[in-house]
Every structure is written in structure tokens, then in C-alpha cells.
Amino acid sequence: MKRPDYRTLQALDAVIRERGFERAAQKLCITQSAVSQRIKQLENMFGQPLLVRTVPPRPTEQGQKLLALLHQVELLEEEWLGDDNSGTTPLLLSLAVNADSLATWLLPALKTVLTDSPVRLNIQVEDETRTQERLRRGEVVGAVSIQPQPLPSCLVDRLGALDYLFVGSKEFAARYFPNGVTRSALLKAPAVAFDHLDDMHQAFLQQNFDLSPGSVPCHIVNSSEAFVQLARQGTTCCMIPHLQIERELAEGELIDLTPGLLQRRMLYWHRFSPESRLMRKVTDALLAHGHRVLRQDTA
């Protein structure tokens, strides 16, 4: 069995984090040539490239797996160090999270962890249908996903559901839906999606109004918070988590355009096994807060 030297793995990790060999060498306090030699040593050990030498460099699939191993080991070392680690370099905590969770419940859930533990948080925003792939590739150590089944050597727990409402402003409703939300009216009503793979709005319209994909005009905006702003200013209708717009609904800035109809996304917390002390803190925090603010009754 090939057992990599973790010093050489740290060189690979530094090149990725620092986006180049020169800055990686400065970070590790060694020469650029030494960084190259350590990575070449790793590549010779595994008989394949571990780094795509682009600008910035990026890891190959095997490189991703090795980096995932390194990040797991770094977290597990915290078990042995205990709590007496003040003054040490904060541990990197890379998580893959959907934008709507980040905009609503996730950061409050992590408040205690970020306050009490020496960590550097690295949030990678991805659609909830694809976050698990980042965990599979070793880019992160934990992921919020809609997938209920764990990956090999991983753990999973249910967090709860986000309920999405089809909303818009009163002015938008008066302009585009004077006779109610109908199939023909929806064909002219501007919508918004997070990216070209975000199909929530389209799935809602297809399920409830038999509208085929691509049949409605749709903006692309990579911001959950911008969805709220666009809806409030009367320029789009869109699917937004109820949790995110409770105030706007209560004050009448936004209205539920299709009362009784919603999209529900059950969320699950995935992470590598075994868990370090830090990851158990993260798990406990996410589950406790998720069970408080996310919908648990899925009937």
C-alpha cells in the first residue's frame, strides 16, 4: 500500500491554496525548487500526475483524493491535540453548501463553532443537488445536500426541509397576473435562476402548470439575496425559501403568488467518517440549529 509523506502532501495543498508554486514556497518557508521536488516525488509514487499545471494550478482526480486524505488527517489530529492548541494555525474547515442555506440558517448554526474553535472557514457554494460531488472529489470535508444516501466512508444525518414559495411583489402580480397565475400568463412573466443548472423554478412550473423547460423568460443571477431584491423591486417572480422572506411576507413587500403550492427540499448533512472532535462540534451545531429552524414535519 502506498503511504504518502504528509510533508509532501502539504506541498501539494499549498500550491492549490496559494494558487502557485512561488507563493506556496513562501508559505512553507522553502525554495520553489523544493516544492516542485516534493510534488514530483508524490507523482512518482503514484505513477500519475497529481497537479494540472495551469494558472492557477488545480489538482487531478487523484490529487483531489490525496488532498481529502490530508484534510481528514489534519482534522483528526485535533483529537490528539485536545483543547490546548492556542496559538496554532487554525484548521481549515471546507464545506460545500447551497446558496439558500448560506443565506438563511447555516451561519447562525456555526456561530458557536467559529467563536470557540480555531478554524478557517472555506465555504464553497454549490447547488444542493451537486454539493455531494464536492465531498466525493475531496474538495470539502462536509456538505449540505438533498441526497439521503451517504457516500462510502461517510456519515449522513437529516437536517430538515426548506420550503420554497413562488413569490413576487403586488405590483408584479398586478402587471403579469391580473387574472391570477395562469399558464399563459406565466409564459410572459420574467423569472430568475441561480445558474443554468438551477431547475427549481422550471420544475415548479412544469409540475403545477405543465410548462416545458425553457418556455419562460429567465434571468441568471448567482446570489440568493439578489432573488429577494429582484422580487421586492417588482422585476421578477421567483422561488425563495419561506425562511428567508418571513419579514417581507408579513409586511406585504412580497406575496405568495400560488397559495397552497410550494417546493420542498429536504436537506442532509454529509461528512467523512470517522469524525474529529471539531467535525463532531460542527455536526452537533448544524443538527441542533437545523432541527430548530428547518421544517421537520414533511407530511
Curated annotation (Swiss-Prot):
Q: Mind listing the UniProt keywords for this protein, alphabetically?
A: DNA-binding, Transcription, Transcription regulation
Q: Which residues form the HTH lysR-type domain?
A: 4-60
- CDD domains, per database record: PBP2_IciA_ArgP
Q: Which PROSITE patterns match?
A: HTH_LYSR (PS50931)
A molecular function (GO) term: DNA-binding transcription factor activity
Q: Which Pfam families match?
A: HTH_1, LysR_substrate
According to the lineage, what is the superkingdom?
A: Bacteria
Identify the Gene3D superfamilies for this entry.
3.40.190.290, Winged helix-like DNA-binding domain superfamily/Winged helix DNA-binding domain
InterPro entries linked: ArgP, ArgP_gammaproteobact, LTTR, LysR_subst-bd, Tscrpt_reg_HTH_LysR, WH-like_DNA-bd_sf, WH_DNA-bd_sf
* Cross-referenced SUPFAM superfamilies: Periplasmic binding protein-like II, Winged helix' DNA-binding domain
Q: Does the keyword Lyase apply?
A: no
User: Which HAMAP family does UniProt cross-reference here?
Assistant: HTH_type_ArgP
Q: What does this protein do?
A: Controls the transcription of genes involved in arginine and lysine metabolism.
Q: Which family does it belong to?
A: Belongs to the LysR transcriptional regulatory family.
Subunit info here reads:
Homodimer.
PANTHER family given for it?
HTH-TYPE TRANSCRIPTIONAL REGULATOR ARGP, TRANSCRIPTIONAL REGULATOR
Q: What is this protein's record name?
A: HTH-type transcriptional regulator ArgP
- The species is Erwinia tasmaniensis (strain DSM 17950 / CFBP 7177 / CIP 109463 / NCPPB 4357 / Et1/99)
* Lineage, top ranks: Bacteria, Pseudomonadati, Pseudomonadota, Gammaproteobacteria, Enterobacterales
The gene is: argP
